[in-house]
Amino acid sequence: MKGLFLRIITALALLFWAIDMVFPWQFLRHTEENHYTAIQARGSLYVGTINNQISYFINKDSERGFEYELAKAFADTLGVELEMKIFDNQEQLFDELDKHNIDLAAAHLLYHPKNAERFQIGPAYHSASWQLAYRKNENRPKNLGNVKKDIYISNNLALEETLKELQKQYPQLIWKRNQALTQEELLLQLAEGKIPYVIANSIDIAAIQQIKPELAIAFDITDEANVHWYLPNNPYRDLQTALLNFMNNAEETGLLDNLKEKYLGHISQFDYVDTRSYMNAIENTLPQFSPLFEKYKGELDWRLLAAVAYQESHWNPDATSPTGVRGIMMLTKNTAQHMKISDRTDPEQSIKAGSEYLHWLISQLPESIEKEERIWFALVAYNIGLGHLIDARRLTQNLGGNPDNWFDVKKNLPLLAEKRYYSQLKYGYARGYEAHQYVENIRRYMNSIVNYHRVQENQTTNDNANNESAVKNLEEIKENKD
Protein backbone atom coordinates (compact mmCIF):
# COMPACT_ATOMS: atom_id res chain seq x y z
CA MET A 1 0.00 0.00 0.00
CA LYS A 2 2.83 2.33 0.97
CA GLY A 3 4.58 1.51 -2.33
CA LEU A 4 1.42 2.29 -4.27
CA PHE A 5 1.06 5.61 -2.44
CA LEU A 6 4.67 6.56 -3.27
CA ARG A 7 4.14 5.64 -6.90
CA ILE A 8 1.01 7.83 -7.04
CA ILE A 9 2.88 10.76 -5.43
CA THR A 10 5.78 10.32 -7.85
CA ALA A 11 3.42 10.14 -10.82
CA LEU A 12 1.61 13.30 -9.71
CA ALA A 13 4.92 15.12 -9.22
CA LEU A 14 6.05 14.15 -12.70
CA LEU A 15 2.69 15.23 -14.10
CA PHE A 16 2.87 18.66 -12.43
CA TRP A 17 6.49 19.05 -13.59
CA ALA A 18 5.47 18.20 -17.13
CA ILE A 19 2.59 20.69 -17.00
CA ASP A 20 4.95 23.30 -15.59
CA MET A 21 7.41 22.72 -18.44
CA VAL A 22 4.84 22.60 -21.22
CA PHE A 23 2.33 25.19 -19.99
CA PRO A 24 4.41 28.33 -20.61
CA TRP A 25 4.89 27.33 -24.26
CA GLN A 26 1.26 26.35 -24.66
CA PHE A 27 0.24 29.56 -22.91
CA LEU A 28 2.45 31.51 -25.29
CA ARG A 29 0.98 29.80 -28.33
CA HIS A 30 -2.54 30.57 -27.13
CA THR A 31 -1.85 34.21 -26.21
CA GLU A 32 0.66 35.11 -28.96
CA GLU A 33 -1.03 36.17 -32.18
CA ASN A 34 -0.48 33.97 -35.20
CA HIS A 35 0.39 36.62 -37.78
CA TYR A 36 -0.44 34.42 -40.74
CA THR A 37 -4.02 33.76 -39.59
CA ALA A 38 -4.37 37.39 -38.46
CA ILE A 39 -3.39 38.57 -41.95
CA GLN A 40 -5.93 36.22 -43.53
CA ALA A 41 -8.63 37.35 -41.09
CA ARG A 42 -8.12 41.09 -41.64
CA GLY A 43 -7.58 40.66 -45.39
CA SER A 44 -4.48 42.85 -45.54
CA LEU A 45 -0.71 42.58 -45.13
CA TYR A 46 0.96 45.39 -43.14
CA VAL A 47 4.46 46.05 -44.46
CA GLY A 48 6.76 48.63 -42.90
CA THR A 49 9.33 50.39 -45.08
CA ILE A 50 11.33 53.60 -45.48
CA ASN A 51 10.53 56.25 -48.09
CA ASN A 52 13.43 56.53 -50.54
CA GLN A 53 14.08 56.12 -54.24
CA ILE A 54 14.77 52.38 -54.03
CA SER A 55 12.45 50.84 -51.42
CA TYR A 56 9.26 52.90 -51.72
CA PHE A 57 8.10 56.19 -53.23
CA ILE A 58 5.06 57.81 -54.81
CA ASN A 59 5.27 58.47 -58.55
CA LYS A 60 2.37 60.15 -60.35
CA ASP A 61 0.05 59.32 -57.44
CA SER A 62 0.92 55.61 -57.58
CA GLU A 63 3.09 53.55 -55.24
CA ARG A 64 6.43 52.37 -56.62
CA GLY A 65 9.69 50.87 -55.42
CA PHE A 66 11.54 47.57 -55.20
CA GLU A 67 10.17 46.66 -51.78
CA TYR A 68 6.67 47.81 -52.70
CA GLU A 69 6.46 45.65 -55.82
CA LEU A 70 7.95 42.61 -54.07
CA ALA A 71 5.60 43.04 -51.09
CA LYS A 72 2.63 43.49 -53.46
CA ALA A 73 3.48 40.20 -55.15
CA PHE A 74 3.71 38.50 -51.74
CA ALA A 75 0.35 39.94 -50.67
CA ASP A 76 -1.16 38.68 -53.92
CA THR A 77 0.05 35.14 -53.21
CA LEU A 78 -1.59 35.36 -49.77
CA GLY A 79 -4.81 36.59 -51.38
CA VAL A 80 -4.89 39.81 -49.34
CA GLU A 81 -4.50 43.56 -49.88
CA LEU A 82 -1.17 45.31 -49.25
CA GLU A 83 -0.94 48.24 -46.85
CA MET A 84 2.43 50.01 -46.69
CA LYS A 85 3.38 51.81 -43.48
CA ILE A 86 6.17 54.37 -43.82
CA PHE A 87 8.86 55.13 -41.22
CA ASP A 88 11.82 57.50 -41.05
CA ASN A 89 14.50 55.07 -39.96
CA GLN A 90 15.31 51.46 -39.16
CA GLU A 91 14.72 51.73 -35.41
CA GLN A 92 11.20 53.08 -35.86
CA LEU A 93 10.59 50.19 -38.24
CA PHE A 94 11.93 47.58 -35.82
CA ASP A 95 10.09 49.08 -32.84
CA GLU A 96 6.77 48.70 -34.66
CA LEU A 97 7.73 45.18 -35.71
CA ASP A 98 8.58 44.36 -32.10
CA LYS A 99 5.13 45.60 -31.04
CA HIS A 100 3.54 43.45 -33.79
CA ASN A 101 2.01 46.56 -35.38
CA ILE A 102 3.36 45.46 -38.76
CA ASP A 103 3.66 41.99 -40.27
CA LEU A 104 7.09 42.44 -41.78
CA ALA A 105 9.83 45.04 -42.32
CA ALA A 106 11.15 45.56 -45.86
CA ALA A 107 13.67 48.32 -46.56
CA HIS A 108 16.85 46.67 -47.88
CA LEU A 109 17.76 45.77 -44.30
CA LEU A 110 21.19 44.24 -43.80
CA TYR A 111 21.65 41.13 -41.70
CA HIS A 112 22.90 41.67 -38.15
CA PRO A 113 23.10 39.00 -35.41
CA LYS A 114 21.32 41.24 -32.89
CA ASN A 115 18.36 41.68 -35.21
CA ALA A 116 18.35 37.97 -36.05
CA GLU A 117 18.01 37.21 -32.32
CA ARG A 118 15.22 39.73 -31.97
CA PHE A 119 13.16 38.77 -35.03
CA GLN A 120 12.48 36.02 -37.52
CA ILE A 121 14.16 36.62 -40.87
CA GLY A 122 13.19 35.77 -44.41
CA PRO A 123 15.49 34.42 -47.14
CA ALA A 124 18.33 36.62 -48.40
CA TYR A 125 17.41 38.32 -51.68
CA HIS A 126 20.26 40.79 -52.20
CA SER A 127 23.47 42.02 -50.56
CA ALA A 128 24.98 45.36 -49.53
CA SER A 129 27.58 46.83 -47.20
CA TRP A 130 28.03 49.83 -44.94
CA GLN A 131 30.20 52.53 -46.52
CA LEU A 132 31.75 55.81 -45.44
CA ALA A 133 30.61 58.60 -47.77
CA TYR A 134 32.32 61.97 -48.07
CA ARG A 135 32.07 64.99 -50.35
CA LYS A 136 34.03 64.87 -53.60
CA ASN A 137 37.09 67.15 -53.72
CA GLU A 138 37.52 66.87 -49.95
CA ASN A 139 40.36 64.81 -48.50
CA ARG A 140 39.56 61.13 -48.82
CA PRO A 141 40.31 59.16 -45.62
CA LYS A 142 41.96 55.79 -46.18
CA ASN A 143 40.51 54.16 -43.07
CA LEU A 144 38.60 55.04 -39.92
CA GLY A 145 41.85 56.04 -38.24
CA ASN A 146 42.19 58.92 -40.73
CA VAL A 147 38.76 60.39 -40.03
CA LYS A 148 39.20 63.66 -38.14
CA LYS A 149 35.70 65.12 -38.40
CA ASP A 150 32.22 64.08 -37.28
CA ILE A 151 30.66 60.95 -38.73
CA TYR A 152 26.86 60.95 -38.91
CA ILE A 153 24.54 57.96 -38.96
CA SER A 154 20.76 57.64 -38.94
CA ASN A 155 18.89 55.97 -36.09
CA ASN A 156 20.22 52.41 -36.46
CA LEU A 157 21.22 50.45 -33.37
CA ALA A 158 22.59 47.50 -35.35
CA LEU A 159 24.99 49.83 -37.15
CA GLU A 160 26.01 51.29 -33.80
CA GLU A 161 26.84 47.79 -32.56
CA THR A 162 29.08 47.36 -35.60
CA LEU A 163 30.79 50.70 -34.91
CA LYS A 164 31.35 49.76 -31.26
CA GLU A 165 33.22 46.67 -32.44
CA LEU A 166 35.29 48.80 -34.82
CA GLN A 167 35.99 51.19 -31.97
CA LYS A 168 38.14 48.49 -30.38
CA GLN A 169 40.45 48.75 -33.40
CA TYR A 170 40.06 52.53 -33.77
CA PRO A 171 39.69 53.95 -30.22
CA GLN A 172 39.38 57.50 -31.53
CA LEU A 173 36.30 56.58 -33.59
CA ILE A 174 33.23 58.60 -32.62
CA TRP A 175 29.94 59.18 -34.38
CA LYS A 176 26.73 61.15 -34.07
CA ARG A 177 23.38 59.42 -34.33
CA ASN A 178 20.77 61.74 -35.83
CA GLN A 179 17.26 60.61 -34.91
CA ALA A 180 15.53 63.46 -36.77
CA LEU A 181 16.84 62.87 -40.30
CA THR A 182 16.52 59.84 -42.55
CA GLN A 183 19.59 58.23 -44.06
CA GLU A 184 18.71 59.80 -47.40
CA GLU A 185 18.40 63.26 -45.80
CA LEU A 186 21.81 62.84 -44.16
CA LEU A 187 23.35 61.98 -47.53
CA LEU A 188 21.72 65.05 -49.08
CA GLN A 189 23.16 67.22 -46.31
CA LEU A 190 26.57 65.69 -46.97
CA ALA A 191 26.26 66.45 -50.69
CA GLU A 192 25.48 70.09 -49.82
CA GLY A 193 28.55 70.32 -47.58
CA LYS A 194 26.60 70.74 -44.34
CA ILE A 195 28.17 67.69 -42.64
CA PRO A 196 31.55 66.01 -43.33
CA TYR A 197 30.89 62.24 -43.32
CA VAL A 198 27.99 59.78 -43.35
CA ILE A 199 27.97 56.01 -42.92
CA ALA A 200 25.16 54.57 -45.02
CA ASN A 201 23.94 51.52 -46.89
CA SER A 202 25.87 51.05 -50.17
CA ILE A 203 22.61 50.77 -52.14
CA ASP A 204 21.33 54.12 -50.85
CA ILE A 205 24.65 55.85 -51.54
CA ALA A 206 24.73 54.57 -55.13
CA ALA A 207 21.13 55.72 -55.65
CA ILE A 208 21.72 59.23 -54.30
CA GLN A 209 24.88 59.61 -56.40
CA GLN A 210 22.63 59.59 -59.47
CA ILE A 211 21.24 62.99 -58.46
CA LYS A 212 24.03 64.21 -56.17
CA PRO A 213 27.32 63.36 -57.93
CA GLU A 214 29.20 65.33 -55.25
CA LEU A 215 28.87 62.24 -53.06
CA ALA A 216 31.89 59.95 -53.06
CA ILE A 217 32.71 56.67 -51.33
CA ALA A 218 35.80 56.59 -49.14
CA PHE A 219 35.77 52.86 -48.30
CA ASP A 220 33.63 49.99 -47.07
CA ILE A 221 33.05 49.86 -43.32
CA THR A 222 31.94 46.22 -43.49
CA ASP A 223 32.00 43.31 -45.89
CA GLU A 224 28.94 42.61 -48.01
CA ALA A 225 26.04 41.31 -45.91
CA ASN A 226 22.79 39.68 -46.96
CA VAL A 227 19.63 41.75 -47.22
CA HIS A 228 16.48 40.26 -45.67
CA TRP A 229 12.90 40.96 -44.75
CA TYR A 230 12.33 40.76 -40.99
CA LEU A 231 9.23 39.30 -39.31
CA PRO A 232 8.00 39.47 -35.70
CA ASN A 233 9.42 36.88 -33.33
CA ASN A 234 6.60 34.41 -32.98
CA PRO A 235 6.19 30.76 -31.94
CA TYR A 236 4.19 30.23 -35.12
CA ARG A 237 6.20 29.79 -38.33
CA ASP A 238 3.34 29.93 -40.83
CA LEU A 239 4.18 33.40 -42.15
CA GLN A 240 7.90 32.64 -42.36
CA THR A 241 7.15 29.43 -44.28
CA ALA A 242 4.84 31.28 -46.68
CA LEU A 243 7.56 33.89 -47.23
CA LEU A 244 10.19 31.21 -47.88
CA ASN A 245 7.98 29.58 -50.51
CA PHE A 246 7.22 32.96 -52.10
CA MET A 247 10.89 34.00 -52.30
CA ASN A 248 11.88 30.66 -53.82
CA ASN A 249 9.19 31.11 -56.45
CA ALA A 250 10.24 34.74 -57.07
CA GLU A 251 13.77 33.48 -57.72
CA GLU A 252 12.63 30.71 -60.06
CA THR A 253 10.21 32.85 -62.08
CA GLY A 254 12.66 35.72 -62.53
CA LEU A 255 10.60 38.21 -60.50
CA LEU A 256 13.58 39.07 -58.28
CA ASP A 257 15.91 39.49 -61.26
CA ASN A 258 13.39 41.73 -63.01
CA LEU A 259 12.97 43.96 -59.93
CA LYS A 260 16.73 44.20 -59.44
CA GLU A 261 17.07 45.16 -63.09
CA LYS A 262 14.29 47.75 -62.80
CA TYR A 263 15.32 49.48 -59.57
CA LEU A 264 19.00 48.66 -59.09
CA GLY A 265 20.37 48.07 -62.59
CA HIS A 266 20.90 51.75 -63.41
CA ILE A 267 22.61 52.69 -60.14
CA SER A 268 25.59 50.42 -60.81
CA GLN A 269 26.72 52.88 -63.49
CA PHE A 270 28.08 56.18 -62.25
CA ASP A 271 30.17 58.75 -64.05
CA TYR A 272 30.82 61.97 -62.15
CA VAL A 273 31.27 64.25 -65.18
CA ASP A 274 28.23 62.90 -67.04
CA THR A 275 26.03 63.02 -63.93
CA ARG A 276 27.15 66.53 -62.99
CA SER A 277 26.46 67.78 -66.54
CA TYR A 278 23.08 66.10 -66.52
CA MET A 279 22.02 67.58 -63.19
CA ASN A 280 23.02 71.04 -64.45
CA ALA A 281 20.86 70.43 -67.52
CA ILE A 282 17.90 69.34 -65.36
CA GLU A 283 18.18 72.53 -63.33
CA ASN A 284 18.85 74.97 -66.17
CA THR A 285 17.72 73.53 -69.52
CA LEU A 286 14.87 71.11 -68.83
CA PRO A 287 12.42 73.76 -67.50
CA GLN A 288 12.16 75.40 -70.94
CA PHE A 289 11.23 72.10 -72.63
CA SER A 290 9.30 70.25 -69.91
CA PRO A 291 5.93 71.83 -70.94
CA LEU A 292 6.41 70.34 -74.42
CA PHE A 293 7.32 66.92 -73.05
CA GLU A 294 4.19 67.02 -70.89
CA LYS A 295 2.04 68.23 -73.78
CA TYR A 296 3.06 65.45 -76.17
CA LYS A 297 3.69 62.58 -73.74
CA GLY A 298 0.60 60.64 -74.87
CA GLU A 299 0.61 57.32 -72.98
CA LEU A 300 4.24 57.80 -71.90
CA ASP A 301 5.68 59.33 -68.75
CA TRP A 302 6.85 62.81 -69.81
CA ARG A 303 10.07 62.27 -67.88
CA LEU A 304 10.86 59.25 -70.03
CA LEU A 305 10.30 61.32 -73.16
CA ALA A 306 12.63 63.95 -71.70
CA ALA A 307 15.23 61.28 -70.95
CA VAL A 308 15.10 60.05 -74.56
CA ALA A 309 15.64 63.60 -75.79
CA TYR A 310 18.62 64.08 -73.48
CA GLN A 311 20.18 60.82 -74.64
CA GLU A 312 19.64 61.88 -78.25
CA SER A 313 20.68 65.54 -78.20
CA HIS A 314 21.37 66.71 -74.63
CA TRP A 315 18.24 68.84 -75.12
CA ASN A 316 19.85 70.76 -77.98
CA PRO A 317 17.22 71.65 -80.65
CA ASP A 318 19.96 72.33 -83.21
CA ALA A 319 21.85 69.07 -82.70
CA THR A 320 23.06 67.35 -85.88
CA SER A 321 24.91 64.08 -86.36
CA PRO A 322 27.26 63.04 -89.19
CA THR A 323 24.59 60.57 -90.36
CA GLY A 324 22.07 63.37 -90.92
CA VAL A 325 19.72 62.98 -87.95
CA ARG A 326 18.71 66.31 -86.46
CA GLY A 327 16.85 68.09 -83.70
CA ILE A 328 16.12 67.59 -80.03
CA MET A 329 14.80 64.05 -80.75
CA MET A 330 17.43 63.41 -83.48
CA LEU A 331 14.99 62.33 -86.19
CA THR A 332 15.99 60.99 -89.60
CA LYS A 333 14.53 62.55 -92.75
CA ASN A 334 12.46 59.43 -93.34
CA THR A 335 11.01 59.50 -89.82
CA ALA A 336 10.25 63.22 -90.14
CA GLN A 337 8.40 62.59 -93.42
CA HIS A 338 6.58 59.60 -91.92
CA MET A 339 5.50 61.77 -88.97
CA LYS A 340 4.67 64.66 -91.34
CA ILE A 341 6.83 67.41 -89.82
CA SER A 342 8.56 70.13 -91.82
CA ASP A 343 11.29 71.39 -89.45
CA ARG A 344 13.28 68.89 -87.39
CA THR A 345 15.04 71.72 -85.50
CA ASP A 346 11.75 73.11 -84.18
CA PRO A 347 11.57 71.66 -80.62
CA GLU A 348 7.79 71.35 -80.61
CA GLN A 349 7.60 69.56 -83.95
CA SER A 350 10.51 67.30 -83.03
CA ILE A 351 9.15 66.31 -79.60
CA LYS A 352 5.67 65.70 -81.02
CA ALA A 353 7.06 63.53 -83.82
CA GLY A 354 9.45 61.66 -81.53
CA SER A 355 6.62 60.81 -79.14
CA GLU A 356 4.31 59.71 -81.95
CA TYR A 357 7.06 57.55 -83.43
CA LEU A 358 7.68 55.86 -80.07
CA HIS A 359 3.96 55.20 -79.69
CA TRP A 360 3.92 53.69 -83.19
CA LEU A 361 6.86 51.42 -82.37
CA ILE A 362 5.11 50.25 -79.19
CA SER A 363 2.01 49.43 -81.25
CA GLN A 364 4.12 47.16 -83.49
CA LEU A 365 5.17 44.94 -80.58
CA PRO A 366 3.37 41.66 -79.84
CA GLU A 367 0.75 41.77 -77.10
CA SER A 368 2.65 39.04 -75.25
CA ILE A 369 5.16 41.65 -74.00
CA GLU A 370 4.01 43.09 -70.68
CA LYS A 371 2.85 46.71 -70.67
CA GLU A 372 5.58 47.97 -68.33
CA GLU A 373 8.37 46.49 -70.47
CA ARG A 374 7.10 47.47 -73.92
CA ILE A 375 8.81 50.86 -73.83
CA TRP A 376 12.29 49.30 -73.43
CA PHE A 377 11.76 47.14 -76.51
CA ALA A 378 10.45 50.18 -78.41
CA LEU A 379 13.55 52.18 -77.46
CA VAL A 380 15.79 49.48 -78.94
CA ALA A 381 13.81 49.81 -82.17
CA TYR A 382 14.07 53.63 -81.94
CA ASN A 383 17.85 53.24 -81.73
CA ILE A 384 18.73 50.43 -84.17
CA GLY A 385 15.48 49.71 -86.00
CA LEU A 386 12.51 47.40 -85.64
CA GLY A 387 14.13 44.67 -87.75
CA HIS A 388 17.11 44.32 -85.45
CA LEU A 389 14.79 44.19 -82.44
CA ILE A 390 12.95 41.30 -84.10
CA ASP A 391 16.33 39.60 -84.57
CA ALA A 392 17.25 40.17 -80.91
CA ARG A 393 14.00 38.57 -79.74
CA ARG A 394 14.44 35.63 -82.11
CA LEU A 395 18.04 35.15 -80.95
CA THR A 396 16.93 35.24 -77.31
CA GLN A 397 14.41 32.49 -77.99
CA ASN A 398 17.01 30.40 -79.84
CA LEU A 399 19.33 30.68 -76.83
CA GLY A 400 16.65 29.44 -74.44
CA GLY A 401 15.52 32.82 -73.10
CA ASN A 402 12.14 34.52 -73.06
CA PRO A 403 11.76 36.87 -76.07
CA ASP A 404 9.04 38.80 -74.22
CA ASN A 405 11.22 39.46 -71.17
CA TRP A 406 13.36 42.60 -71.28
CA PHE A 407 15.93 41.19 -68.85
CA ASP A 408 16.55 38.22 -71.17
CA VAL A 409 16.57 40.19 -74.43
CA LYS A 410 18.81 42.94 -73.09
CA LYS A 411 21.55 40.41 -72.24
CA ASN A 412 21.63 39.23 -75.85
CA LEU A 413 21.65 42.61 -77.61
CA PRO A 414 25.49 42.78 -77.76
CA LEU A 415 25.48 39.45 -79.65
CA LEU A 416 24.00 41.24 -82.69
CA ALA A 417 27.52 42.51 -83.39
CA GLU A 418 29.11 39.04 -83.33
CA LYS A 419 29.42 37.33 -86.72
CA ARG A 420 28.60 33.83 -85.44
CA TYR A 421 25.19 35.19 -84.39
CA TYR A 422 24.30 37.97 -86.85
CA SER A 423 25.19 35.77 -89.83
CA GLN A 424 22.24 33.57 -88.87
CA LEU A 425 19.80 36.47 -88.47
CA LYS A 426 17.50 38.05 -91.06
CA TYR A 427 18.61 41.67 -90.63
CA GLY A 428 22.30 40.98 -90.05
CA TYR A 429 24.84 43.04 -88.14
CA ALA A 430 23.76 45.69 -85.63
CA ARG A 431 25.53 47.61 -82.87
CA GLY A 432 23.46 45.87 -80.24
CA TYR A 433 25.90 46.81 -77.48
CA GLU A 434 25.09 50.47 -78.21
CA ALA A 435 21.35 49.79 -78.07
CA HIS A 436 21.86 48.05 -74.72
CA GLN A 437 23.70 51.08 -73.34
CA TYR A 438 21.23 53.45 -74.99
CA VAL A 439 18.31 52.00 -73.02
CA GLU A 440 20.33 51.82 -69.79
CA ASN A 441 21.23 55.51 -70.12
CA ILE A 442 17.61 56.51 -70.71
CA ARG A 443 16.44 54.55 -67.68
CA ARG A 444 19.10 56.22 -65.57
CA TYR A 445 18.26 59.68 -66.91
CA MET A 446 14.54 59.17 -66.31
CA ASN A 447 15.05 57.95 -62.74
CA SER A 448 17.27 60.94 -62.04
CA ILE A 449 14.54 63.36 -63.16
CA VAL A 450 11.97 61.52 -61.02
CA ASN A 451 14.18 61.54 -57.95
CA TYR A 452 15.43 65.09 -58.45
CA HIS A 453 11.84 66.35 -58.34
CA ARG A 454 10.97 64.01 -55.45
CA VAL A 455 13.84 65.39 -53.37
CA GLN A 456 12.90 68.97 -54.29
CA GLU A 457 9.29 68.37 -53.22
CA ASN A 458 10.38 66.75 -49.95
CA GLN A 459 12.69 69.67 -49.16
CA THR A 460 9.90 72.15 -49.91
CA THR A 461 7.54 70.20 -47.63
CA ASN A 462 10.14 70.12 -44.85
CA ASP A 463 10.89 73.85 -45.26
CA ASN A 464 7.18 74.67 -45.06
CA ALA A 465 6.81 72.49 -41.96
CA ASN A 466 9.81 74.20 -40.34
CA ASN A 467 8.40 77.64 -41.18
CA GLU A 468 5.02 76.71 -39.70
CA SER A 469 6.76 75.43 -36.58
CA ALA A 470 8.77 78.65 -36.28
CA VAL A 471 5.63 80.78 -36.64
CA LYS A 472 3.85 78.69 -34.02
CA ASN A 473 6.79 79.08 -31.61
CA LEU A 474 6.77 82.85 -32.11
CA GLU A 475 3.02 82.96 -31.43
CA GLU A 476 3.51 80.92 -28.25
CA ILE A 477 6.31 83.24 -27.12
CA LYS A 478 4.07 86.25 -27.78
CA GLU A 479 1.22 84.67 -25.79
CA ASN A 480 3.56 83.98 -22.88
CA LYS A 481 4.71 87.61 -22.90
CA ASP A 482 1.12 88.81 -22.92
Swiss-Prot record:
Residues 458-482 are annotated as: Disordered. GO terms for cellular component: cell outer membrane. The active site is at 312. It catalyses: Exolytic cleavage of the (1->4)-beta-glycosidic linkage between N-acetylmuramic acid (MurNAc) and N-acetylglucosamine (GlcNAc) residues in peptidoglycan, from either the reducing or the non-reducing ends of the peptidoglycan chains, with concomitant formation of a 1,6-anhydrobond in the MurNAc residue. Residues 458-470 have a biased composition (Polar residues). It is found in: Cell outer membrane. Its EC number is 4.2.2.n1. GO terms for biological process: cell wall macromolecule catabolic process; cell wall organization; peptidoglycan catabolic process. Disulfide bonds: none annotated. Residues 1-18 form the signal peptide. SMART domains: PBPb. One of its GO terms (molecular function) is peptidoglycan lytic transglycosylase activity. Residues 268-482 are annotated as: LT domain. Residues 19-267 are annotated as: Non-LT domain. In the N-terminal section; belongs to the bacterial solute-binding protein 3 family. In the C-terminal section; belongs to the transglycosylase Slt family. The N-terminal domain does not have lytic activity and probably modulates enzymatic activity. The C-terminal domain is the catalytic active domain. Murein-degrading enzyme that degrades murein glycan strands and insoluble, high-molecular weight murein sacculi, with the concomitant formation of a 1,6-anhydromuramoyl product. Lytic transglycosylases (LTs) play an integral role in the metabolism of the peptidoglycan (PG) sacculus. Their lytic action creates space within the PG sacculus to allow for its expansion as well as for the insertion of various structures such as secretion systems and flagella. This is Membrane-bound lytic murein transglycosylase F. It comes from Haemophilus influenzae (strain ATCC 51907 / DSM 11121 / KW20 / Rd). The lineage of its organism: Bacteria, Pseudomonadati, Pseudomonadota, Gammaproteobacteria, Pasteurellales. The gene is mltF.
